[in-house]
């Protein structure tokens, strides 16, 4: 089962004992705005990069073909 981007972010927040409010502050947005994005799993690539940086993580985006080839 694949996790959504929001689920992955929440897992990392939990692992780091960090709140959504703290992440919102670290990424320069309101807690409400980030909560809305998390509830809809609606992020731009820039959002994800900023969140990853605030969490001390790297982001890797790959495209996978049906034959298993990745780019």
Model-derived features with residue positions:
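Flexible coil/turn residues that form the inter-helical turn or adjacent wing/linker of helix-turn-helix
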Residues: 5, 16, 44
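Short alpha-helical DNA-recognition segment
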Residues: 17-32
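Key DNA-contacting residues within the recognition helix of helix-turn-helix
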Residues: 10, 35-36, 49
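Recognition helix of helix-turn-helix/homeodomain-like DNA-binding domains
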Residues: 28-43
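The alpha-helix within a helix-turn-helix
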Residues: 13, 24, 52
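Short C-terminal boundary/hinge segments that cap the last helix of small helical domains
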Residues: 56-71
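A detector for short, charged/polar N-terminal pre-domain segments
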Residues: 1-3
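Short, basic-rich loop-to-helix N-cap that marks the start of a DNA-contacting helix
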Residues: 40-53
């Amino acid at each position: 089962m694949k996790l959504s981007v929001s689920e992955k972010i929440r897992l990392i927040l939990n692992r780091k004992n960090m709140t959504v409010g703290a992440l919102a502050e670290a990424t320069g947005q309101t807690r409400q705005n980030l909560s809305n994005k998390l509830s809809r799993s609606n992020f731009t690539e820039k959002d994800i990069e900023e969140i990853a940086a605030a969490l001390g993580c790297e982001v890797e985006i790959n495209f996978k073909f049906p034959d298993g080839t990745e780019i």
